UniProtKB/Swiss-Prot annotation:
The keyword Calcium does not apply. This is UDP-N-acetylmuramate--L-alanine ligase. Pfam families: Mur_ligase, Mur_ligase_C, Mur_ligase_M. SUPFAM superfamilies: MurCD N-terminal domain (SSF51984), MurD-like peptide ligases, catalytic domain (SSF53623), MurD-like peptide ligases, peptide-binding domain (SSF53244). ATP binds at residues 113-119. GO terms for cellular component: cytoplasm.
């Protein structure tokens, strides 16, 4: 990895989920890390406590003295810090390129796919941690075992998410990769689904001749690209042509018990059939690395997922679950897992749409994603820096979901109004699911505190 001339690294948007993990690893390696973000957050506070100097707001002078400037895909090219760095001749690189630097002299394991990257990366990191390999792990959410979303290990392995959203995963140099699924997403960057498939083909073929590509054989879009993958392929899934096969799936107390090849049985610690596939991806990689099944089994049966991945925030008279799901496929999978785990209880889902472009391009899919909840509350769209699109908004989406489902669907507008709605409709034994990638997570904390104060008073 680079040394010598590069000592001071500045991050624009350092509080982002893809950025702060890299910053943590570099801090732990002794680099001087500075950064900027639009607002203070717990992530920013944690980085400050680790020794990073962080500015709130973007100002050209923030980059002074930096040897390299790292920016996220959310940073626009007219950002004043980015412009200043270019004016001064300071190298500016996307986060994917810095992540590639961390991987360059390690045995890289990269988890790719439209959904499930954080969970699968966390699973692989947990399994390898049980072996004594002591991997470096960089994920998109805070993992309880690490107390953060990154861990600097002393071993030869680095396990990381491979983010396809801006094509930056093509900068990585992994030895083993997993492709969990391919879905229509990030239409602002990719032209169409075929364009997305092409990117995953190119990503898979970056693996060296001695590496391997684990693929979900049950995903049709992945099946379509397999003939163009030129490297060793490990097929995982529940179909009979899988190399690593999960079978005899049984639902017990809302979680899945299943067998794997002739290795043995696993009772997964987290709910949802989609997590069976995430586990099979992690198992495929671990078996390829020679990890004994008994170690894999112990790790997955005691696995604690990253924050906002079906995170139970409160479990009293009402159960409150906070989840990052923001794509129709993720929403349906999370709602299905909720129904399996809490069968017979009333489910109330709150969804904050994320980005106008995503809501517009996947609108009909969103409309058809809320058949499971008894009550759905839709907030206004979280813009994530985008300009509004006239034809889509939260109120219209809520109305169209109501027409599609024939169930109670309410428009919450902002978080405060949504909170007021929830205070009036929540009853004892309800399950409240908070969904979205924006700031809706604040609502899970707010309503959890309200319920603690009201414990015993709900009817």
């Amino acid at each position: 990895m680079f040394r010598g001339k590069v000592r001071h690294i500045h991050f624009i948007g350092i509080g982002g989920s893809g950025m702060n993990g890299i910053a943590q690893v570099l801090l732990n390696q002794g680099f001087t890390v500075t950064g900027s973000d639009l607002k203070e957050s717990q992530t920013v506070i944690n980085l400050k406590n680790m020794g990073a100097k962080i500015y709130i707001g973007h100002d050209p002078k923030n980059v002074d003295g930096a040897d390299v400037v790292v920016y996220s895909s959310a940073v626009k090219q007219d950002n004043p810090e980015l412009l200043r760095a270019k004016q001064l001749g300071i190298p500016t690189i996307p986060r994917g390129e810095m992540l590639a630097e961390l991987m360059r002299f390690k045995y890289g394991i990269a988890i790719a796919g439209s959904h499930g990257k954080t969970t699968t990366t966390s699973m692989v990191g947990t399994i390898l941690g049980k072996t004594g390999y002591d991997p470096t792990v960089v994920i998109g959410g805070k993992l309880e075992a690490y107390g953060s979303n990154a861990k600097l290990g002393s071993g030869d392995f680095i396990v990381t998410e491979a983010d396809e959203s801006d094509g930056s995963f093509l900068k990585l140099t992994p030895t083993i990769v997993s492709i969990n699924n391919i879905d229509l997403e990030h239409i602002g960057f990719y032209k169409n689904l075929n364009d997305i498939k092409r990117a995953f083909i190119d990503f898979a073929n970056k693996v060296p001749f001695y590496g391997a590509v684990a693929v979900n054989i049950d995903d049709q879009n992945i099946k379509d690209i397999i003939p163009e993958i030129e490297k060793k392929i490990i097929r995982f899934g529940i179909s009979e042509d899988s190399d690593i096969r999960g079978y005899d799936l049984r639902l017990e107390n809302g979680r899945y018990r299943f067998k794997v090849n002739d290795f043995g049985e696993i009772y997964l610690s987290i709910p949802g059939k989609h997590n069976v596939y995430n586990a099979l991806a992690a198992i495929s990689i671990s078996v390829e690395l020679g990890v004994p099944f008994c170690v894999i089994k112990e790790a997955l049966e005691n696995f604690k997922n990253a924050n906002r991945r079906f995170e139970i925030k409160y479990d009293g008279s009402v159960t409150v679950i906070d989840d990052y799901a923001h794509h129709p496929t993720e929403i349906k999978a999370t709602l299905s897992a909720t129904r399996e785990m809490f069968d017979g209880r009333r489910i109330i889902a709150v969804f904050q749409p994320h980005r106008y472009s995503r809501t517009f391009s996947l609108y009909d899919h969103f409309v058809r994603s809320f058949n499971i909840p008894d009550i759905t509350v839709i907030t206004e769209i979280f813009p994530a820096g985008e300009s509004p699109i006239d034809s889509v908004n939260g109120e219209k989406l809520s109305s169209d979901i109501k027409k599609e489902t024939g169930k109670t669907v309410l428009y919450g507008e902002d978080l405060q109004k949504t909170f007021n709605i929830l205070k009036n409709i929540l009853k004892k034994d309800d399950v409240l699911l908070i969904l979205g990638a924006g700031n809706v997570t604040r609502l899970s904390d707010q309503i959890s505190q309200f319920l603690k104060n009201k414990e015993g008073a709900l009817r």
